[in-house]
Amino acid sequence: MKMANSLRGEVLKLYKNLLYLGRDYPKGADYFKKRLKNIFLKNKDVKNPEKIKELIAQGEFVMKELEALYFLRKYRAMKQRYYSDTNKTN
């Protein structure tokens, strides 16, 4: 029972982190929130701790991918702002 509670905490933490990251999702926060909720509800009946750990790892991977997507978008915006003038003069 103790393991289930600790995994539940990890799952909730993952959900909250993904929900926070979804605010800047390119297709909109509402789209992301609906998809996220559906995915978590689809797996709500999983009881096997090993399977739950696999799903948490998969969620953490998605979180890292989202962070990379956002950093890339910011990098491109900054590059366009600061280096667009130098490209026009060449």
Swiss-Prot record:
Top-level taxon in the UniProt lineage: Eukaryota
Keyword RNA-binding recorded: no
Any GO molecular function: enzyme inhibitor activity
Keyword Zinc-finger recorded: no
Keyword set, alphabetical order: Mitochondrion
GO biological process per UniProt: negative regulation of oxidative phosphorylation; respiratory electron transport chain
A GO-annotated cellular component: mitochondrion
Subcellular location: Mitochondrion
Primary localization class, coarse: mitochondrion
Family: Belongs to the complex I LYR family.
PANTHER family (alphabetical): ELECTRON TRANSFER FLAVOPROTEIN REGULATORY FACTOR 1, GROWTH HORMONE-INDUCIBLE SOLUBLE PROTEIN-RELATED
Subunit structure: homotetramer. Interacts with NDUFAB1. Interacts with ETFA. Interacts with ETFB.
Function: Acts as a regulator of the electron transfer flavoprotein by promoting the removal of flavin from the ETF holoenzyme (composed of ETFA and ETFB).
UniProt protein name: Electron transfer flavoprotein regulatory factor 1
Gene: ETFRF1
